[in-house]
Amino acid sequence: MRWRHSGSFLRMTEGGSRMRKACRFWALIMVVALLASPAFGVEAGTMTPEKETAVKWLDTHAAVGAETATYIWHNPELGLGEHKSSAVLQEMLKAAGFKVESGTAGMKTAFVASWGEGKPVIGIHAEYDALPGLSQAAGVAEEKILVEGCPGHGCGHNLFGTYSSMAAIAIKKAMEEHGIKGTVKLYGTPSEETLVGKAFFVKEGIYKDADAVLSWHPGTENSVSYASSLAMDNFKVRFHGKASHAASAPWAGRSALDAVELMNIGMNYMREHVRPESRIMYCIPDGGKAPNVVPPYSEVWYFIRAPQYKMVKEIVDWSKKVAEGAALMTQTRMEFVPITAVWQYLPNQVLAKVGFANALLIGIPPFTDEDEKIAEPFSRSLKEEKGPFLSREFKEFDYDKPFSWATGGGSIDEANTSWVVPMVRFSTSTLAKGTPGHSWQSVAQNILPPAFKAGITVSKYMAATALDLFADPKLLEDAKAELKASNEKHGPFVDPVKDVSLPTFQLMHNVEESQVPVQTKGDMPLPDFSTLK
């Protein structure tokens, strides 16, 4: 006898009819039991009339989301230079009746869109910056550059900004129709890839009236995160020396590049003596202009990561001393330039459970066989040979146990947000299995139908979760109490950028904004937002 697994059911391929009937009976019992039992300690939420309104609105306006995400994909822009991306989201929200204030926290491409009045205030994060040098043709399962040196949406922020905005509008529609009191805010946060936007939102007190903030990120899995992230510090070290002819009078010069190299050597020896979970990364944006000139100027750029910010700070403080030593050895002048810094993300158990209950209620994205055909060549290009090629399940977290600090992975600027207001983070499978972030495969897929379908699904997760928070003040009270207790146990949070100036575009990207190649020349027509009124 041979068994095959098909979805949630077991099918027999051989055997008598009585055995097949018995199999169907026990399979049905198993499915009923699974549906009746809590998943990962959380029961599926309840579909209320308010949630039905939001879900129906999102289904009806799915095309607007796809058009907006497509517009942003075709206009990829680096952090703090996301003028078209920010503008199209602002236009979308204005068309839907939101009040929009731009230039938030001193950033031209930042904004806050608000609707409603009074408490509670539920916020949603939106991101829309692209990554440098990731230009890639849409839907092509092989590397194919569109514009050499142009940015590309390798982290799916064209989806992030769009479907966060769609969720905010859906919440507003439900609040209007059902007379719900309170305020919904969409935080347009630029420059996430360099960990700037939300860090400086926290510094400037932008979240001071928020009761909870919801967020999400595109990826290869469906989940409601109950995990932390690595803390990080982002800084440059500039060395100033003295130019001279490198052949005829090298003794008259003082090499800034020598100082950079000596600092890097010292940092590499340091690695043995820091915690193994730490990460020390660097590149040299400027190492001189010509070999026959003693470099009078050179700079090195460092990212320092660790499970907790206090560990990061220890390494950064040591790094400054290494830099000072390099300057002494080369008789150059050292300049330490902080850019930004973030703590580790602080999960909130109360909100994670509410979020996951609503994710279970809505379900995973309704992918079809056609979606699988779209995803398959991308998974195969990454040696993922077995389907399904789009995730059909939720990632498991044990929401009843205390979380652990991260020991690997990346860093996020909304980590700082999570220490000042309760947060929950969602993810949906916008990408084929095996797709790494920040890759050409990711860029190529972030404009395809499966990504749009997953985007609408996560909008439903966030809308349903927000409506639960509006309906039950006790949830917000408990989430805030948990945040206070977490700060007392793991903090208190000290803003790592409180004495740091907002970085310039050139400081972050080592190029002037006008020098960044453009993918779409001229003005691409905006999506039709008339149906949002």
Model-derived features: where do they sit?
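Divalent metal-coordination and catalytic microenvironments
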Residues: 72, 113, 124, 157, ...
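Short, Lys/Arg-enriched N-terminal segments with co-localized hydrophobic residues
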Residues: 1-18
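Bacterial N-terminal signal peptides
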Residues: 27-38
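Sec/Tat signal peptide C-region and signal peptidase I cleavage site
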Residues: 18, 37-41
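Histidine/acidic-residue-rich, glycine-tolerant segments that coordinate divalent metal ions
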Residues: 144-152, 158-159, 175-295, 305, ...
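Sec/Tat-exported extracytoplasmic proteins
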Residues: 61-62, 69, 73-76, 97, ...
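Metal-dependent amide/peptide-bond hydrolase catalytic core
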Residues: 42-45, 261-533
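Acidic/His- and Gly-rich active-site-bordering loop/insert found
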Residues: 45-153, 158-183
